[in-house]
Swiss-Prot record:
The gene is apt. The keyword Cytoplasm applies. Catalyzes a salvage reaction resulting in the formation of AMP, that is energically less costly than de novo synthesis. Homodimer. It comes from the Bacteria. It comes from Oceanobacillus iheyensis (strain DSM 14371 / CIP 107618 / JCM 11309 / KCTC 3954 / HTE831). This is Adenine phosphoribosyltransferase. It is found in: Cytoplasm.
Length: 170
């Protein structure tokens, strides 16, 4: 399936100069979204996944149906102040700013094989920070899966040594 047919490009959002890749048309088409999730699940099935981890917020949209299909848990990575129990945190940069990501301290057991999912790989800052959180808790990142990769931002360079799946590249 040609997933790019379901991505809307929004100019100058969230700020001038950004060409935002809107995945909501893909999500709105049940067959297209199922096909995208199925491709990630097929990839994950080769990895013996114990847990799916996804950063806020669109990583939840991708990760939850993948974890459901794999019959494994999902651990959310959230912005600072959004998780109610004890967390670990890491600072990170993204395509259009700076932020802090957190995960519950007990979200990952040492040795768990983790798939990280998100909608988009841009500069790689969000996923690099997510990997740091997973590894600080003793998880083993066995793959990263994205709907969209912005190749011109070289985010994949930050994921050297990790297996990466992207369904679309711009």
């Amino acid at each position: 399936m040609e997933f790019k047919n379901y991505i809307e490009i929004v100019e100058d959002w969230p700020k001038e100069g950004i060409k935002f890749k809107d995945i909501t048309p893909l999500m709105a088409d049940g067959k297209a979204f199922k096909s995208a999730v199925d491709e990630i699940v097929d990839y994950a099935n080769t990895k013996e996944i114990d847990l799916v981890v996804g950063p806020e917020a669109r990583g939840f949209i991708v990760g939850c149906p993948v974890s459901y299909a794999l019959e494994v848990g999902f651990a959310p990575v959230r912005k600072e102040g959004k998780l109610p129990r004890e967390v670990i945190k890491v600072d990170y940069g993204l395509e259009y700013g700076e932020n802090v990501l957190t995960i519950h301290k007990d979200a990952i057991k040492p040795g768990q094989r983790v798939l990280i999912t998100d909608d988009l790989l841009a500069t790689g800052g969000t996923i690099e920070a997510t990997i740091k959180l997973v590894e600080q808790l003793g998880g083993i990142v066995v793959g990263c899966a994205f709907l969209v990769e912005l190749g011109y931002l070289d985010g994949k360079d930050k994921l050297e040594g990790y297996d990466v799946l992207t369904l679309m590249k711009y």
